[in-house]
Amino acid sequence: MKTNIPARAARIDWSALARALLKPLALVLALVLVVFVVAAPSEKKRSAPAVPMMNKVLMIGDSLSVAKFGDVMRDFLVSTCGARNVAVFASCGSSPENWLRPEPTFFTKCGYREQTPARSVVLDRRLHLATPKIESLVATYRPDTVIVQLGTNWMDRLTTSDTPQKEAELSDIMDRFIAAARGRRAVQILWIMPPDSSHFSKRVQSTVENLISAAAQRDRFETIPSRRITHYVPGKTGRDGVHYNPEASEEWAKRVIVRIKRTLPLSEIYAGQ
């Protein structure tokens, strides 16, 4: 007779069960790790977005910049650098020496432009306003770039008296002007030379161009020779052989702007600090 021996309970393989449970858990953890690694750099990039770095620009000129040419130039500078970074001054009848502090104050009688982040004044009628001094403008606005549109009014002086002594005097004025425009900072300077004129002789126009070009070589600044991109046709371009009508002024400004874009890095994008 057989003794009743209870049947041995089936043995559970816990190691196989653990392996079965750990596999999906490991897969989930791996996916989480991959997502974290991929997302981390993009999060870092979002924390440092590209920030526009704008140059501060000061532009000064004569009656040509009081008129339409000045409108177009200012619109371009504001669209490129922002209104808070642009200051434009123009005084009808002025020459480089009139903007220098040691020289007597020049009062314009035919037009004035002053457009800054704080105010906007454009007057083309007869008045009696003092031309500001470039030393004060540089100290106030601290420009990175100074754009100059001056020189046409020297042609009157050279028409009546063009001597080596006179040209030496004007060369000295150029050097003083550039030194004042730079101040103590590494300011970039661009000189827009006078456009073509049917009133002044080619000799006088070339003399002014040569004075500015020689100063550019000595003092290391950029120039735009406007005579190469303009042609004054009496009755079409203007009436007096010197001043350009609105249409001609705008066309001249557009051609100048094309050259400015090739010459000056007025605005760029950089990784913010």
Where are these regions (language model features)?
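N-terminal secretory targeting modules
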Residues: 1-60, 64-87, 139-142, 263-273
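Conserved SGNH/GDSL esterase-like catalytic core that processes O-acyl groups on lipids
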Residues: 54-59, 64-163
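Catalytic His-Asp segment of secreted/periplasmic serine-dependent ester chemistry enzymes
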Residues: 82, 195-273
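Alpha-helical scaffolding within the catalytic cores
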Residues: 128-137, 172-177, 209-210
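A structural motif corresponding to the C-terminal end of an alpha-helix
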Residues: 141, 176-189, 214-221
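Active-site segments of SGNH/GDSL-like serine hydrolases
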Residues: 147-158, 177-209
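Active-site cleft segment of glycoside hydrolase catalytic domains centered on the general acid/base Glu
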Residues: 158-173, 204, 208, 244
